[in-house]
Amino acid sequence: MEHYISLFVKSVFIENMALSFFLGMCTFLAVSKKVSTAFGLGVAVTVVLGISVPVNQLVYSLILKDGALIDGVDLSFLNFITFIGVIAALVQILEMILDKYFPALYNALGIFLPLITVNCAIFGGVSFMVQRDYNFAESVVYGIGAGTGWMLAIVALAGITEKMKYADVPAGLRGLGITFITVGLMALGFMSFSGVQL
């Protein structure tokens, strides 16, 4: 149990997808204007990561891995296309659920919801799972932890951005300029966790 807790904490703080690996920056910067929208996208990314990492782990270990189906047959050259297909299917299902049950959030996310399919944070989580050879339980914990870390980062950035509307930001830095500086300072803050050994 301690191993899973340390894996979760590590994936949220030490190896944060957004602030340590800088993955998923497109939607991270574009949807971080309001906390409510950022939280909704963060939950969507967490759900997709929490489902796609373990599902892709099963696909990899039962079908694609060397010798999984037949001894001597290695289908790992199909990793990328298979993982992207699974992620795309999961995002389509999530999009239909949000459209039916949460139309306000669906409309607020707009074009960025289908873009979760090509969000490199999602694919990065799946790639890290293969690279680190996680089992199914570790994949579930890592997927949820990585999504939670990404959500924590985007909600924190949205909260800071909302507060900065009332600050006297120099004209040349308004918009993305001050956002990049803020993200850099947040990343420096998260670097303090890199010395923690779990």
Curated annotation (Swiss-Prot):
Keywords: Cell inner membrane, Cell membrane, Ion transport, Membrane, NAD, Sodium, Sodium transport, Translocase, Transmembrane, Transmembrane helix, Transport, Ubiquinone. Composed of six subunits; NqrA, NqrB, NqrC, NqrD, NqrE and NqrF. Coiled coil: none annotated. It is found in: Cell inner membrane. PANTHER family: INTEGRAL MEMBRANE PROTEIN OF SOXR-REDUCING COMPLEX (PTHR30335), NA(+)-TRANSLOCATING NADH-QUINONE REDUCTASE SUBUNIT E (PTHR30335:SF1). One of its GO terms (molecular function) is oxidoreductase activity, acting on NAD(P)H, quinone or similar compound as acceptor. It comes from the Bacteria. InterPro entries: NqrDE/RnfAE, NqrDE/RnfAE_oxidrdctase, NqrE. One of its GO terms (biological process) is respiratory electron transport chain. This is Na(+)-translocating NADH-quinone reductase subunit E. It comes from Histophilus somni (strain 129Pt) (Haemophilus somnus). Belongs to the NqrDE/RnfAE family. Its EC number is 7.2.1.1. NQR complex catalyzes the reduction of ubiquinone-1 to ubiquinol by two successive reactions, coupled with the transport of Na(+) ions from the cytoplasm to the periplasm. NqrA to NqrE are probably involved in the second step, the conversion of ubisemiquinone to ubiquinol. The gene is nqrE. GO terms for cellular component: Gram-negative-bacterium-type cell wall; plasma membrane. NCBIfam families: nqrE. Its main location: membrane. The chain crosses the membrane at residues 11-31, 35-55, 77-97, 110-130, 140-160, 176-196. It is a multi-pass membrane protein. It catalyses: a ubiquinone + n Na(+)(in) + NADH + H(+) = a ubiquinol + n Na(+)(out) + NAD(+).
